[in-house]
Amino acid sequence: MKMAESHPDVVLSVRDLRVAFGRNSPVEVVHGVDFDIAPGEVVAVVGESGSGKSVTALSVMGLLPEGAHATGSIALHGRELLGLRPKELQQVRGAQVALISQDPVASLNPVFTIGFQVVEAVRAHDRSLGRRAARRRAVELLELVDIPDPQRRMGQYPHELSGGQCQRVGIAMALASDPRLLIADEPTTALDVTVQAEVLDVLARLGRRDGRGILLITHDMGVVADIADRVVVMRDGALVEDGPVQEVLTSPAAAYTRQLLDAVPRLGQRDEEEPAASDRLMLEVRDLVVEYGGRLRGVVRAVDDVSLDVRRGEILGLVGESGSGKSTIGRAIIGAAPVTEGGIVIDGTDMSTVSRAERTRIRRRIGVVFQNPATSLNPRYTVRESIAEPVATIGGLRGRELRERVESLLIDVDLADRRDHYPHQLSGGQRQRVAIARAVSLDPTILIADEPTSALDVSVQAQVLDVFRRLQERLRFACVFISHDLAVVDELCDRVAVLHHGRIMETGPRAQVLRRPQVAYTQRLIAAAPVPDPVLQRARRAERLAASAS
């Protein structure tokens, strides 16, 4: 085994890292990767799905799955990690290296309070601490990550916190052992832009203040520009470019890096010319109120007096932070959320005035695309079978008609060569294209797309959006596109409605709302949207920190 060169100014040193899967005929998936992380430095590893970035992070943590084998050198403060026994690796994990996961809610136990979980994390690394001392330390950690009113939050459960607050709790737990290296795996993917900015500020401050190294795994070039000092670009398991963030993002040497940057949607790129909309109203939402809860926990008004409409061939973007009510509106339209007050009119039919059977018939003409296609596809069905299912069971097609319809849809979503694959054999973008094909298979009059690209890499996102746009232009369905990514909304939508705490704050043509916002809240959302420009992102962070300090 090649031994690491110990250097006092390096937290992590990776040399000639190679990872192979399988024992009899091993397949190498990471090919000779080298990089270092200095104290207080944030190094971002970027690349598409399958690039090897997550496998590299798992190698550092010593968490490769059974059957995987790593060679080369991974040294933490000069100590070689490859070759350590499991018990020795367990002592390194948590104590010297800690992981911040992608899904902040899933990483917390829903049946225990926040305080219990942070205290347990503290005591796991220092059993000499008593319960009272561990509780004081837990409160200090919550304060460190800017959790408001930490004493009160200690008694709350994960479901009572927002996604951003749950992610901060996850960071606090990762800091419980005062690790020298933090590995942040897509830490802001599930967060809206304003919360994302706040979490990135916390990470940047913690790294620089305490001299921790941070290994950031991400596909978001705006996040890279905001927080990273250096960038490692990976493709197909190999390192294709490595350098300072300013150099890599503004003057990339590798064609692949330029390709990644070109795929990033940017606010303001699309011209301001608005397409002519049809006069036919396909969807009307009038004075909609949606409430949850009851006598025990009180009533929460998730949607408060919302009115909007969408015409044939038009895409309306719903944007806003987590908890703004945008997804609840989508669920109310498809009948999956209770309508407390107000009404929903679909293609001229008031849904509150028709029978249940008629509502079911009408809603069959509404297509839905969810954020995570893996949960909406049957793992036992091939691509062809998944697309055929709604066409046969609801559309009633059989035999040759069914085969021709499915083949046409496969071509529409560029998956004709994947017709006999199963979901686990597809990439995230390919699975989402299957979901889109299913959603449009019955020629919907309305389509609800709820964060359909938020979990995808930028180049894959661009491919999915291109498929989506082609289908919408040809089929002319009315679309409600729910997203927290303003650049994607700017690229795709015709009109935009901005939501905050269940109310519409601003609505109008896309260019008007996103170029000349009239409401302070919309202006704040736009200012928080990350862009792949390190100079601009650093200036924005300085403004944010100055505003929060005043």
Residue ranges and their predicted role:
Residues 69-80, 342-350, 362:
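Conserved ABC transporter NBD signature motif
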Residues 81-98, 116, 124, 131, ...:
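ABC ATPase NBD coupling module
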Residues 133-152, 350, 400-417, 527:
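Conserved ABC ATPase "signature" region
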Residues 156-161, 165, 422-426, 430:
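Conserved ABC ATPase signature
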Residues 176-180, 441-445:
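A short, proline-enriched helix->beta-strand linker immediately N-terminal to the Walker B motif
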Residues 242-243, 251, 507-508:
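ABC ATPase "signature
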